[in-house]
Amino acid sequence: MRDGVGQDVIERLGSRDLNDDGEIINLAIVGSSRYYDYSNFESLIDSWIEMNGYPDLIIVGGASGVDYMAERWAVNNTIPVAIFSEEWDDPRRGLEDRGRPEAPNSLTEKILKSSSHILAMPSATSKWTRVVIKEAKERRIPIEIHELE
């Protein structure tokens, strides 16, 4: 369900206007690893596209929940996806959270450096996603936030 190791995909595709619309959109999608409502996820990303344009590349951290649904959405829509699974000690992924430890700081930095836009979907228990939100705001990376219940 992926195009390759995250950093390799970024280096190969990250600076290209893959859909020839005149704009490069490298959309990082981050959010709760315990959120599994694909229908709502799809509505949120469709709404984002209406406002911002079609992404050339989807960037995810390789966790469960929102990250996994973003991978699935990218594949279903024939959009390349960069998955930073190399940042995890336990690279096994799936839709449901299996209690893997929090993401390393290096993952946060790679996602922020690679993205032109961020779509964040945190829940009340999201820690890492809130770090990404804070850093994106400080760096003035365009970000849209949808709080999940």
Map each language-model feature to its residues.
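Acidic/glycine-enriched connector segments
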Residues: 2-26, 33-149
